[in-house]
Swiss-Prot record:
Name the UniProt record assigns to this protein: Uncharacterized protein At5g43822
Top-level lineage group: Eukaryota
Lineage, highest ranks first: Eukaryota, Viridiplantae, Streptophyta, Embryophyta, Tracheophyta
Organism listed in the record: Arabidopsis thaliana
One GO CC term on file: nuclear envelope
Pfam families linked to this entry: CA109-like (PF15011)
PANTHER family xrefs: OS10G0566900 PROTEIN (PTHR37904:SF2)
């Protein structure tokens, strides 16, 4: 039984690596989002002829500035899409870990054995539920981020500072991945390592 639990713990170590990768991606995602939303907020002001003061005497300055900012915004949105692909890779890894966990559970035919505990070690049911929750959390957060990216693209045409602020809160907060719940899962799985 201990050998089986060690296999599960290996899966959770891989999951922890994916979560660290996710967190690094999250830092990039937040930075890209903030930069893109700053440009979106400025675009409306840039299209106001009164904003250029003495620079209005330069022919085409307004169009040039707006074009340059739109180019930067396109680049940021492309980078955000690339980060989304990397987030999706993490989701697929969690899906595979969960699928592998289901196969491991199938090997253990007896219900009693699936719920059996040895000391503080987790039972197989704890392990499978933990992987399932981690997969669901990251998949849900990926879908939220995907929706945020779509909404951000729509806000280019009609920017709203209130909407951008609300989206920024969601981007930073990651509401689908509550840190205390994630920590609890790892505390259960690695209980014997906690000192």
């Amino acid at each position: 039984m201990e050998a089986v639990i060690r296999k599960w713990q290996q899966k959770f170590r891989k999951g922890k690596e994916e979560m660290e990768k996710w967190e690094a991606l999250q830092v990039r995602w937040v930075s890209l989002f903030r930069n893109a939303s700053s440009i979106i907020q400025r675009l409306q002001e840039m299209q106001n002829h009164g904003s250029y003061g003495a620079l209005r005497c330069l022919k085409g300055i307004e169009d040039a500035v707006v074009q340059q900012q739109m180019g930067q915004l396109e680049s940021l949105l492309r980078s955000m899409k690339n980060v989304m692909e990397e987030f999706w890779g993490c989701v697929l890894t969690f899906e595979k870990l969960h699928r592998d966990g289901l196969q491991l559970r199938e090997i253990e035919s007896s219900k009693r054995r699936v719920e059996e505990r040895i000391g503080v070690k987790p039972c197989i049911t704890d392990c499978l539920e933990g992987l399932s929750i981690l997969y669901d959390m990251h998949q849900s957060e990926y879908h939220l981020k995907s929706s945020i990216l779509s909404v951000l693209s729509c806000l280019i045409l009609k920017p709203s500072p209130g909407d951008l602020n609300a989206l920024q809160y969601l981007v930073v907060d990651q509401p689908n991945i509550p840190k205390d719940e994630v920590q609890h899962i790892f505390d259960v799985i690695f209980a014997e390592e906690i000192k």
